[in-house]
Amino acid sequence: MSLKLVITGASGHIGTRVCQLIGDQAHIVALVGSAEGREKAQAAGAAEVHVVDLDQPEGLAELFAGADAVCVITAGDAKPDRERNALEAAAKAGVGYAVKLSSESVTLAEGRPGEPDPIAARHSANESDVQRLFDRFAIVRPTWWASLDQLPFVKAGLAQGQFAWPRRDTSLAPIAPDDVAATIAALLLKPSAGTRVLSLTGPETLTIEQIAGHYAAALGSPVEVPDLTPESYVDWLTEHTPMTNEQAQGTSAILTPFADRRDAPVSDAVETVTGRAPQRFTDYLAANFSPESLTQK
């Protein structure tokens, strides 16, 4: 009998990849939030698709009946109750294993003074839900995506010949979305006993200057890295993007814990779980980035 896997957020950019990678190796039940999401999940290969409102927990448990695992993938700015309702419904239905897509921001928020940024706070709350409800689970904490140029504020900067970050003298280890999805798919298809919390990164640490240089090579034109602080980065955002001051402060709060860490670590978790090395940033750009993408909405 094949595995039965229930995936929330199966219509998003990671969820669809997970469905495609699993294919007919398991019976996928996709939970999506709209008719458009239904079409995307079906096209990605989900065997069953249900349009549900995760804010309304009534009736969710029956969708998890007989499932071997639940995978929760929701937008970083979603309210904690959405994942909590899905996880509690899965546990109530007797599902024994959970995989959660979290964020490295949780790692960086641990031990930092003050309140964590909203994304770290939400993921931290839902990680606690996973740990409370399941004896077997895997939590994956990817760092920044290699698709940095898809972030509106990065795209706006690149279109103006700049790659702005709260600090110039720092680094990232960007990870390709395909590698995140491949790790999640492998964890679902071959669940291990016990619990795992995995930090996911790309294969190399790149300085902000190096990242800008790779974009410059892809664009065929210079990309400047302005010398900013978290405070002046807020001013940069309000000047170079449509963000309000409040939105800019929120964005700076999310990025600053990463910017304060000068040397981004590299993890071998992707290769350990999937059996292959993660994609290099330059290879990701060659396959996925073009100058024309900066003018596309």
Predicted regions and their residues:
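Terminal hydrophobic/aromatic helix or amphipathic segment near a protein terminus
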Residues: 214-260, 297
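An amphipathic alpha-helix signature
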Residues: 209-213, 230-235, 282-285, 290
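Oxidoreductase cofactor-interface core, primarily capturing Rossmann-like NAD(P)-dependent enzymes
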Residues: 2-41, 55-58, 65, 76-84, ...
